[in-house]
Amino acid sequence: VAQAVILAFSALLIIPSALQARVQGGNKKPSLSLKATPAVSFAPARVVVVAEVRGGADDNEEFYCPTVEWEWGDFTTSTAEADCEPYEAGKSQIRRRYTVEHQFKNPGSFRIRLMLKKGTKVISSANALVQVRPGLGPPGGDQQ
């Protein structure tokens, strides 16, 4: 009887990886972080922005196949929609990383905002600040 109890207890300690992910916070809502590089530059500035979805289950239905909307802070926006297969619990995988490049032609402070949306509902958003300083002018141009 003691051996049966020990074996049953040992079997409980061996948790399949998918179940283990859920036990370790996989049911928590993922969070979104945003980083712009470089954070400070000269106009015209080419900035690379990386967004990461952290935490939560890899098959989180709410974060599966969202519309991705970027507000650049310079009165322009970008939107992307993926053509995804229908969601299947335990099979569908959320995208964990979004990378995009944007050019700021004029100097200023810009608040970049990324929104992940399902229809019109924002499911998560994140912000990053970029500072673009006046450029030195055209190469070989007169500096007055």
Regions found by a protein language model. Give the residues of each.
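Extracellular/lumenal mature domains of secreted and surface-exposed proteins
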Residues: 17-144
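Bacterial N-terminal signal peptides
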Residues: 4-16
